[in-house]
A protein has these predicted regions:
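Extended beta-strand/beta-hairpin segments
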Residues: 4-76, 84-165
Length: 165
């Protein structure tokens, strides 16, 4: 496994990107937050020009299990960021990726009030002409460059598997 123990510094000439979202609570059932069980945890995440994402709390906290909760969104962000960097590095190094799937997992310790571990488990299929050892090694570069992993305050481990077509 590759562990998130890389310190990232930003060059002085690096471009700054800005992101804007709106989270709108849609769970007022008529009496607002008059008491703990009087309201729904449902909300909508919005961003200009994008499809809305229905959200709620984890079902353990009275959330709707059919909607994305913040913990799942955080895990999905870590997984997607790693995947995007991995594909970038593969393209740069002549590795042809044909398929990529990550069944990522996260652990949250309620007493600690934070995520305590994220485990990415990418399963990658590469072309027969691609080097599987290099394809595996490029997960380290992707992890090093992943903005989300570099932002998180919990270990992010990578348990990658490479298969040739």
């Amino acid at each position: 496994s590759i562990r998130n123990n890389i310190t990232r510094t930003t060059p002085m000439t690096a471009k700054t990107h800005h992101y804007h979202t709106r989270t709108e609570w849609t769970g007022n059932l008529g009496v607002g937050t008059a008491h703990y069980t009087a309201y729904s945890r449902d909300h909508i995440h919005r961003a200009p020009g994008k499809a809305n994402i229905p959200g709620s709390a984890d079902p353990a906290y009275r959330g709707d299990p059919a909607r994305w909760n913040p913990e799942e969104l955080l895990l999905a962000a870590a997984s997607a960021c790693h995947k995007l960097w991995y594909l970038h590095h593969c393209a740069d190094h002549g590795i042809t990726v044909l398929a990529y799937r990550d069944d990522a997992e996260a652990e949250m310790n309620e007493a600690a009030g934070r995520m305590t571990a994220i485990r990415l488990k990418p399963r990658v299929t590469i072309s027969a002409a691609s080097d599987p050892a290099l394809a595996l090694a490029l997960h380290h570069d992707a992890h090093r460059d992943c903005y989300i992993a570099n932002t998180l305050n919990c270990p992010v481990t990578i348990d990658a598997h490479i298969e040739q077509a």
